[in-house]
Amino acid sequence: MKVAVLGAAGGIGQALALLLKTQLPAGSKLSLYDIAPVTPGVAVDLSHIPTDVEVKGFAGEDPTAALEGADVVLISAGVARKPGMDRSDLFNINAGIVRNLVEKCAATSPKALIGIITNPVNTTVAIAAEVLKKAGVYDKNRLFGVTTLDVIRSETFVAAAKGLNVADVKVNVIGGHSGVTILPLLSQIEGVSFTDEEVAALTTRIQNAGTEVVEAKAGGGSATLSMGQAACRFGLSLVRGLQGEANVVECAYVDGGSEHAEFFAQPVVLGKNGVEQVLAYGDVSAFEANARDAMLDTLKADIDLGIEFVK
């Protein structure tokens, strides 16, 4: 199993690479690419960790060598948020980065499962899809927007608010991956009830959690460590699905035939072909139904921005 991380010298990329080096199945290969010249050194550093995962690093303008034979490609390349920026401010820089990297994926590893981490995910996934379509290799079951950070935040915040063991808390998060498009389905959590005020407060905190980290780091970065953990969890789930493990389910932002938008985050079953099945997200509360309906114009505009960028 070969996993490639594009953007591996960044804050998310290095955290993700460390976690993958320690958690990928024995015999796996981990390929690190970044434009930054430090990248081969990151690979050497990681290679000293005693796990049976071979690590190689590649730097420069061309990621082709890193992508050859990749089963999974995780893209975290781009600039991070700074105070005062929202995810859409990142579009002007990160859109071109994602386009160029996905063009290389299309040429070098067209069958790989591609997980997009680079923000704004609502838009960058649409960009990736259009690039793959232009190259004639688009398979909607092999492209994912990684929204796992919204899931782990939801689980963490709910457990803290209710005094629960976080390992026992499971939350589906639907919609997109920025602001009001992030919708945790708190009404579905088994054995837990919330007041209307708690639901509103938790939902808002989950939606604004990225800003919470950006402000707390005071200009020194964004959510890199928690995002690295979230991306590792999702990447390992992709690998487990590829290896034939049954019942691997994660929420992801996919082209899954949603009635709501061309791309929509919801639970999916992962397998040997990527998405094996898109699962219905089930019954929602009145609050959640209203929030879902209210987000759709924003989500669709984000998607259209990505489509138009490639055209």
UniProtKB/Swiss-Prot annotation:
GO terms for cellular component: cytoplasm. Pfam families: Ldh_1_C, Ldh_1_N. It comes from Shewanella piezotolerans (strain WP3 / JCM 13877). Signal peptide: none annotated. The gene is mdh. Belongs to the LDH/MDH superfamily. MDH type 1 family. Homodimer. GO terms for molecular function: L-malate dehydrogenase (NAD+) activity. Substrate binds at R81, R87, N119, R153. The active site is at H177. This is Malate dehydrogenase. Catalyzes the reversible oxidation of malate to oxaloacetate.
